Amino acid sequence: MNIDGIPTRTLRAHPDRRAIDIIDQTRLPHALHWVRVATLEEAAHAIRAMQVRGAPLIGATAAYGLAIALDFEASDRRLAEAVALLGATRPTAVNLHWALARMENILRPLAPEARCDAAWAEAAAIAEEDVAQNAAIGQHGLKLWNDLIVADGQTLNIMTHCNAGWLATVDWGTALSPVYAAHDAGVPVHVWVSETRPRNQGLLTAWELEQHGVPHTLIADNAAGLLMRNGKVDAVIVGADRIAANGDVANKVGTYLKALACADNGIPFYVAAPRSTLDFACPEGASIPIEERDGDEFRLVHGLDSRGVPSALRQLPAGEDVANPAFDVTPNWLVKAIITERGVCPASRDGLLALYPEEARG
């Protein structure tokens, strides 16, 4: 996608294959800052601190982090330590574990001296596959938008939650890929952007939509139901951090409430995700671990002060107890359809297996 009109991806590997550069998303939308990741520990920190976030981008970053780790030492012990460290950073995002398992399955049988080159090649393949899959999701989603248009020149009002755009992937995004596809095809589209407290990832969505020229409006999370009730929303689309085998969806906390509001107002609720987000080994949403993050994300508000200096302000009295779950689970019956790189399917085991019959072996 574009930043100031320049095609840009969220991460880039150095030609010497010793490091990667990532966008520090904790500094957006106020500053675009690139960070060099040159050690295993830096890669783990980038994922844990949400300098990179979004399940597909987490997976790609972890793959490169493993390649970086093997630059220093490629022994069996180093491989196991790197997989364990990276795998513990974000428990809900299944793309992380998918990418690490894929890397380890390829690297483990190789002699240590062959692992470094193979690791960098496989990490690059994971990144390129992510771009292609997300572009395909966009085209499948565009067909759904066309079905919603009932009058020439009608503006489609799409609501989203959190950030599942290109900042959450290597490029294109998942939930926003159909939005970009529609905009680029000349379909009038407007996006209601939910702020997504407490980390306000909706600001990232608004920032990237602005970069691409897509009309949008930022809203408070609690305004979503009112907009639906007043007929101002044609569809809701979100990404996912993990989709269970039965079609239950783990996504940013607050997703479940939007799905409930959609059901009450007859609005289709779509989930967009690539194969790497599908966890066929997880039978249902109740089996998905829910990450609990530091309460200071809730206690503190980050922004720029009157001088334009980044600042953090405490909004709660000292010692106030808070709960800060990062995700919730939306049951499959609230999901109109799941959009993947292979097509659109019902949110059910049968629906997913129709697109991925090779998984029926399990």
Curated annotation (Swiss-Prot):
SUPFAM superfamilies per UniProt: NagB/RpiA/CoA transferase-like (SSF100950)
Pfam families membership: IF-2B
Domain of life: Bacteria
Keyword terms: Amino-acid biosynthesis, Isomerase, Methionine biosynthesis
Catalytic activity: 5-(methylsulfanyl)-alpha-D-ribose 1-phosphate = 5-(methylsulfanyl)-D-ribulose 1-phosphate
GO biological process: L-methionine salvage from methylthioadenosine
Cysteines joined through disulfide linkages: none
Family of the protein in this entry: Belongs to the eIF-2B alpha/beta/delta subunits family. MtnA subfamily.
Protein name: Methylthioribose-1-phosphate isomerase
Naturally occurring in which organism (per UniProt): Dechloromonas aromatica (strain RCB)
